């Protein structure tokens, strides 16, 4: 059976939710029995987002095979409950690098290398790569940015060519656009959408469906108008309203008939040629999850101490992991964002004294590091549940070395090259590397869990695999003194003996990890470390009277059908 391709473009403005739409559509098709994957093309010149400032880009999401990617891949994995790879995120910089490398190798036989055909052909190669594996029935391809952006034009040309080569029954274009409501006029305006589609048509692309992002329900008249002036059928004009939770969007799209629109086009004779594709999606698990999500029994406060908390997309996978970890136990986590720069001995009590747990987030650079160290100290001394991720683990070890081992000035060589007690040091294989991009310890590595440890109790396994993104590690030369003072290193890499997990056995829940468990949380399978941490925080919240009644989120959209909720 030939792989089908859905191309998702955007118009009028960025940040419309193409990633959430793609993930939600993928879930609707997956729940019909189809094998689906989603990829994203980013038009920027960076080879990957690994060296970009989180204020510019948000979180860098890491795949099993070590790709540093856009945060939308986190949405794809969480919604579809399956991993992505290097082939799921491609940038213009990567495309050009591949083409230039081929030219240097003589692959083009002396021809003049141009955008057409060479850059376009490289884009088409990556668009088809996942489908050619034979593992997927449907590949959804999201194009970053908006129609009309100069940097996006090669991608539109690649789609035009593929649509011609693969045929209309094997391709589909979904165009997301904004339908603004003008309060003064008291009506929804379609003109921006008309101009956006006109721009798409100028590139030789006729959208098959128009997805209308709006704060208000679009009327039948608005649908007819968009249908008439944008050359699509009325049933192909889909509204995608603002929702209380991104996890409601699959049901909102289901109610709009989005799944039927796709399968009727791709599989018109489902009973004969494709028994794998069912007529209706089985969303029972999703609906059960959403019921628990929207009806929690209690709310607990957890502090997220980080450097970039003003831009919450920088910690997107962590905040989503909190949400998903609480759902099975019907607990709503209220995240208190604490800028690590604001923490001092004078402010730490006011900032952390009213939370049920402290998570110290990953990061780079020395700004705010002392605040993170102070947060770890406060949690240890007050026996507040503590979870340190990547740099969070390193800060907890620095704090322990200073105040338990008595090593005054102990630090990481990332921040103090001359420290007398370099408890955190650059990994040996990193010392000869000068390039920044794509050179960290990236991707999935093994972690052997010590029997009898809290980590073993949580994982219920002797060996696990987790994703990494770091250059610095616990210094094994000083590690054994930390052990003597009561710290336990309950997880290590079996090949390199690098520390992966640290815990303090005498505390109620004090654990740090060098890897990033937030990258392995999905709707169907919240990460066990986050689940255990949230449970420990819930127990502490009950002891300290920090539990509150759940606060309903501000209602921004029509409620879901009562048959679901």
Curated annotation (Swiss-Prot):
EC category name: ligase
Residues reported to bind Mg(2+): 72, 142
Chain sites annotated for binding UTP: 14, 189-194, 225
Organism superkingdom: Bacteria
Residues that coordinate or bind ATP: 15-20, 72
Task performed by this protein: Catalyzes the ATP-dependent amination of UTP to CTP with either L-glutamine or ammonia as the source of nitrogen. Regulates intracellular CTP levels through interactions with the four ribonucleotide triphosphates.
Protein name: CTP synthase
Protein's gene: pyrG
């Amino acid at each position: 059976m030939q792989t089908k391709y859905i191309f998702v473009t955007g118009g009028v403005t960025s940040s419309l939710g193409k990633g959430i739409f793609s993930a939600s559509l993928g879930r609707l098709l997956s729940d019909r029995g189809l094998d689906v994957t989603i990829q994203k093309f980013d038009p920027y010149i960076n080879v990957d987002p690994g060296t970009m400032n989180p204020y510019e880009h948000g979180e860098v999401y890491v795949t099993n095979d070590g790709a540093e990617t856009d945060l939308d891949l986190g949405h794809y994995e969480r919604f579809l409950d399956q991993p992505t790879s290097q082939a799921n995120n491609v940038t213009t910089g990567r495309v050009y690098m591949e083409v230039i490398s081929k030219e240097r190798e003589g692959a083009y036989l002396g021809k003049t290398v141009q955008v057409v055909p060479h850059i376009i052909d490289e884009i088409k190669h990556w668009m088809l790569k996942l489908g050619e594996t034979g593992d997927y029935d449907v590949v959804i391809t999201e194009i970053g940015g908006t129609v009309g952006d100069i940097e996006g034009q090669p991608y539109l040309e690649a789609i035009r060519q593929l649509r011609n080569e693969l045929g209309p029954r094997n391709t589909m274009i979904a165009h997301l656009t904004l339908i603004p409501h003008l309060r003064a006029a008291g009506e929804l305006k379609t003109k921006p959408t008309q101009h956006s589609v006109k721009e798409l048509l100028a590139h030789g692309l006729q959208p098959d469906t128009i997805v209308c992002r709006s704060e208000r329900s679009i009327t039948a008249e608005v649908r007819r108008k968009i249908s008439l002036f944008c050359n699509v059928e009325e049933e192909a004009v889909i509204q995608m309203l603002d929702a209380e939770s991104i996890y409601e969007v699959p049901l909102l799209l289901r109610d709009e008939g989005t799944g039927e629109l796709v399968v009727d086009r791709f599989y018109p004779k489902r009973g004969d040629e494709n028994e794998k594709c069912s007529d209706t999606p089985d969303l029972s698990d999703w609906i059960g999850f959403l019921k628990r999500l929207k009806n929690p029994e209690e709310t607990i406060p957890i502090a997220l101490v980080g450097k970039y908390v003003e831009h919450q997309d920088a910690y997107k996978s962590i905040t989503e992991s909190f949400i998903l970890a609480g759902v099975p136990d019907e607990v709503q986590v209220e995240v208190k964002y604490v800028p690590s720069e604001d923490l001092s001995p004078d402010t730490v009590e006011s900032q952390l004294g009213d939370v049920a747990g402290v998570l110290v987030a990953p990061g780079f650079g020395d700004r705010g590091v002392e605040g993170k160290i102070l947060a770890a100290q406060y949690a240890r001394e007050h026996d507040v549940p503590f979870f340190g991720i990547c740099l969070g683990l390193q800060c907890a070890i620095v704090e322990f070395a200073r105040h338990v081992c008595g090593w005054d000035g102990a630090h990481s060589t990332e921040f103090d090259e001359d420290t007398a007690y370099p408890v955190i040091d650059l990994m040996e294989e990193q010392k000869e590397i000068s390039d920044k991009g794509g050179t960290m310890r990236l991707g999935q590595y093994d972690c052997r869990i010590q029997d009898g440890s809290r980590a073993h109790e949580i994982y219920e396994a002797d060996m696990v695999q987790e994703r990494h993104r770091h250059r610095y590690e616990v210094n094994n030369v000083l590690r054994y003194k930390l052990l003597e003072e009561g710290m336990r290193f309950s997880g290590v890499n079996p090949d390199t003996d690098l520390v992966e997990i640290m815990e303090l056995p005498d505390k109620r829940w004090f654990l740090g990890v060098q890897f990033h468990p937030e990258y392995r949380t999905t709707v169907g399978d919240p990460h066990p470390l986050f689940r255990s941490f949230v449970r420990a925080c819930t127990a502490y919240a009950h002891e300290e009277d920090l539990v509150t009644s759940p606060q309903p989120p501000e209602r921004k959209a029509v409620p879901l059908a009562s048959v679901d909720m």
